[in-house]
Amino acid sequence: MSATAPFKTLSAKAAFQLDQELMSTGEFSIDQLMELAGLAVAKTIYKEYPPNETTTTTKNKFNPNKVLVLVGPGNNGGDGLVAARHLKLWNYDPIIYYPKRPASNQLYSRLIKQLQDLNVPELTTLTEVKHLLDSRDSKIKIIIDSIFGFSFKPPIREPFKDLINYLGQNHDHLPPIVSVDIPSGWDVDEGPGTEIDIQASCLISLTAPKPCAKLFVNSGPDKIHYLGGRFINPRIAKEYGIEDIVNKYQGDELIVKL
């Protein structure tokens, strides 16, 4: 779906300031925000790419709802880990690739332990990722791009440069890519630069859309754009001029299609 009604956006600077305000005067903890953001990502996946029934035979149980979650080193990656946990509980079969982890961070260690307790497998090399995606019988239904968020500054560095290059160069035969907040590799305010574009099919803007979201919805036909992260109070919404965004939610919705 291409762009329809206009929507307000938050620049990278404003998004950073809003995040800081949420965790100071707003009294939110980082794990609260990450849990709500990751839940919004999972709900978007469920709505746009609902799970198929798992088939059971006498010999094995086949889950056709495989999801590859590409996890970055920061909060965006944490959102992906949370989403993977929810999806596992909703009859998906997530697999994570997490090549660069924060050192000695209890929050991320807990998220990983939660996935391990659910028997969520982890790939450890890019070669494994390529083999999985290039295999005709891989059955990957969706790729979640939770590598870089709104704080990303180019250029893209390893261990993610080769991964993003691979996604961009092979997007024609890959399953749909769902990007969390920003298509990884894009500048939050300016959009895609001269580097490879991963050609995401769906974008989930968190808190409020960033300027690159407008470029995303106009970058091709059938682009899907959702808003998630319903935790902004009216005072903050007014302060940042995003009342119209907050008011798009209806009833108990945690996500809304823009």
UniProtKB/Swiss-Prot annotation:
SUPFAM superfamilies assigned to the protein according to its UniProt record, in alphabetical order: YjeF N-terminal domain-like
Carries keyword Translocase? no
Q: What class of enzyme is it?
A: isomerase
Q: Name one GO molecular function term.
A: metal ion binding
Q: Where is the YjeF N-terminal domain?
A: 15-244
Please write the reaction equations for the catalytic activity of this protein. (6R)-NADHX = (6S)-NADHX; (6R)-NADPHX = (6S)-NADPHX
Instruction: Specify the protein name.
Output: NAD(P)H-hydrate epimerase
